[in-house]
């Protein structure tokens, strides 16, 4: 993973099915992978991380919903600290090319 990308995990608890579905789609569109219900993982740039925060503001109700973004190192730790996952569940980042 290059210096421009960070490995992150996004976890959320969203009451409304419609808002939860929209957030799920938005996180997939950013390039994150769902690894559990309401948990996403992947590599993002600083701009993509800001886009996630904007989606939280746009979609979530601060009185009812919760979400967090944390830096992680699951590729390195998955074999030691995870149950039910393999290294294949956390593949290396692929290059991003400008067309």
Where do the PLM segments sit?
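Basic nucleic-acid-binding interfaces
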Residues: 2-9, 15-99
